[in-house]
Swiss-Prot record:
Subunit structure: Homodimer.
PANTHER family according to UniProt: AMINOTRAN_5 DOMAIN-CONTAINING PROTEIN, SULFURTRANSFERASE-RELATED
Gene name in the database record: ttcA
Motif PP-loop motif in this chain: 45-50
Keywords: 4Fe-4S, ATP-binding, Cytoplasm, Iron, Iron-sulfur, Magnesium, Metal-binding, Nucleotide-binding, RNA-binding, Transferase, tRNA processing, tRNA-binding
Protein name according to UniProt: tRNA-cytidine(32) 2-sulfurtransferase
GO biological process, one term: tRNA thio-modification
Physiological role: Catalyzes the ATP-dependent 2-thiolation of cytidine in position 32 of tRNA, to form 2-thiocytidine (s(2)C32). The sulfur atoms are provided by the cysteine/cysteine desulfurase (IscS) system.
Length: 302
């Protein structure tokens, strides 16, 4: 019985690994994230996402039709209790080239951010600036971050609800100074899959003592909302992500993205055969009453 369970577990693990490899490979190809000769700086925090990203990239590196270099980089921010030996030991065992950057951003954050306030914003800005500079130093052509599909979707709603912007987290980004390209190879991967993969692989997870135990209330609220939607309407998360990749500016309202001001009638265009029916909603498109109730429930956001 134990042998049977082990074979079943191995089969499930193989399916999960193949799915993550396929999704990561698709994202890399779709956005041309990694090119021949690239030196990719893989940013490791010690969390499940970055461990999974490195593992999958190492696997893809063996079979990719192009040659690229991977260099792991961790930033030791001098947080109390940070286990400095964990990542060096892990990376040395893998045989992966790595660098540990030591920057005492912890003291800066604690000095600047009032007690009880979320430190994530300032902490990430300080970390980003350091990583950008270090990428220049080592000649990295791409900076890989471990954000996944759920991070991207949550960021979309955070910006909508709290920032008044239709803005998410792009799979590929040119930095403001145009000196660095940031890639997110796990952009197509679900957090649930990543968490399970990390558990099965037994990665030596390092908790963040600075912000990991500090609940980011806004992001947590959005995460819970999305989980509730997914339970009630399975597949909704993937549909939202599909929408992020299928933007139609003419159906929104941003004057910078679409020239609404200069819209003009073109009488030479082919006319609709029966203009009286052009704006009618066909019966097949009319939702059933129970469907209407469901959509109203979805909008009841507290």
């Amino acid at each position: 019985m134990t042998s049977l369970n082990q074979r079943k577990d191995r089969l499930e693990f193989n399916k999960l690994q193949k799915r993550l490899r396929r999704q990561t490979g698709s994202a890399i190809v779709d956005y041309n994230m990694i090119e021949d000769g690239d030196k990719v700086m893989v940013c490791l925090s010690g969390g499940k996402d970055s461990y999974t990203m490195l593992d999958i990239l190492l696997s893809l590196q063996q079979t990719a039709p192009i040659r690229f270099e991977l260099v792991a980089v961790n930033m030791d921010q001098k947080q109390p209790g940070f286990p400095e030996h964990v990542l060096p030991n892990y990376l040395a065992q893998l045989g992966v080239p790595f660098h540990i950057i030591e920057r005492d951003t912890y003291s800066i954050v604690k000095e600047v951010v009032p007690e009880g306030k979320t430190t994530c914003g300032l902490c990430s800005r300080l970390r980003r600036g350091t990583l950008y500079g270090f990428a220049d130093e080592i000649g990295a052509t791409k900076i890989a971050l471990g954000h996944h599909r759920d991070d991207i979707i949550e960021t979309l709603f955070l910006n909508m609800f709290y920032g008044g912007k239709l803005k998410a987290m792009p799979p590929k980004l040119l930095s403001d100074d145009k000196r660095n390209i940031v890639i997110r190879p796990l952009a197509y991967c679900a957090e649930e899959d990543i968490a399970e993969f990390a558990r099965l692989k037994g990665f030596p997870i390092i908790p963040c003592n600075l912000c990991g135990s500090q609940e980011n209330l806004q992001r947590q609220a959005v995460k819970e909302m999305l989980h509730a939607w997914e339970r009630q309407f399975p597949g909704r998360t993937e549909t939202i992500f599909t929408a992020i990749r299928n933007v139609q500016p003419s159906q929104l309202g941003d004057l910078e993205l679409f020239d609404f001001v200069n819209l003009a009638i073109d009488k030479t265009a082919t006319a609709v055969e029966d203009a009286s029916d052009a704006c009618a909603v066909p019966n097949w498109h009319r939702p059933a009453q129970e469907e209407v109730v469901q959509y109203v429930d979805v909008l009841d956001i507290h």
